[in-house]
Amino acid sequence: MKILTWNCNGIRARFPLIKKIIELEKPDLLFLQETKIEDKIFPEKEFHNLGYEFLFYRGEKSYNGVACISKVPFGDCGYKNWHDIEDCRHIFVKIKNTTIHNFYVPAGGDIPDTTVNSKFLHKISFLREMENWLRDKPSNRNEIILGDLNIAPLPDDVWSHKQLLNVVSHTPQETDLLLDVLHSGSFEDLIRQFFPIPEKVFSWWSYRSKDWRHSDRGRRLDHIWATNSISKRVSKVNILKDARGWDKPSDHVPILVEIELV
């Protein structure tokens, strides 16, 4: 089964590219973040025309939003409001006996200080709640977390570890906390399973960088994690970097995983 995750940065603006990636990669499941669209105008018909019958989404005007676009039926589905804020950052679906969570973690603003930046406080609180939520789950469960987690946790997940230590998305407070979330849930990092350290791996390049490919000042903000029962069934992980160079791109690129779900 092919699973693709992508922060599309606006489903309406990026729909031609979503259609293109579907035609190129033919994913069975497509998980989108930052859809920026209200549920009442979600493009259901357009996805049905592309062969995706099963949809679950939560969205709001201009901000946030997550979606699952599927060729295969799912059982349970739902969401959680994190940190008691209804801002459409999470959904889950159950495929066979595996639960897949789609997250869009808050970016955190510009100043990495919870005392002066409410957006950074929201991010840290969100992650701590994720950690507590995962801690008591059984380690032998079948579970995947994917999406835009808005943190590059390892030194080789950014173009310059030294220069980004005080930049939101790579501060020690964030990176330590995200790794705590990973470990509290007994997850494996599927991208690093296939692209081991010290290989530099990025999934995001700023719009401010005109020659993004040459300068390659990227960060790995997008992730796919799986519990052990699932991680050993993964046959391929591919970061679709060329999508960053398409016309009117997202600043994130899609990530594709091929996996046998149980």
What are these regions (language model features)?
Residues 1-49, 63-66, 153, 262:
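N-terminal, active-site-proximal structural segment of metallo-dependent hydrolase catalytic domains
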Residues 1-9, 97-112, 116, 146, ...:
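Active-site-proximal beta-strand elements of phosphoester/diester hydrolases
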Residues 35-110:
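Structured beta-strand-rich core segments of catalytic domains in phosphoester-bond hydrolases
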Residues 50-51, 126-223:
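Metal-dependent phosphoesterases centered on the DNase I-like endonuclease/exonuclease/phosphatase
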Residues 62-76, 212-233:
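Conserved beta strand-loop-helix elements of the APE1-like EEP
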Residues 238-262:
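Surface polyanion/phosphate-binding segment centered on an Asp-His-Pro turn
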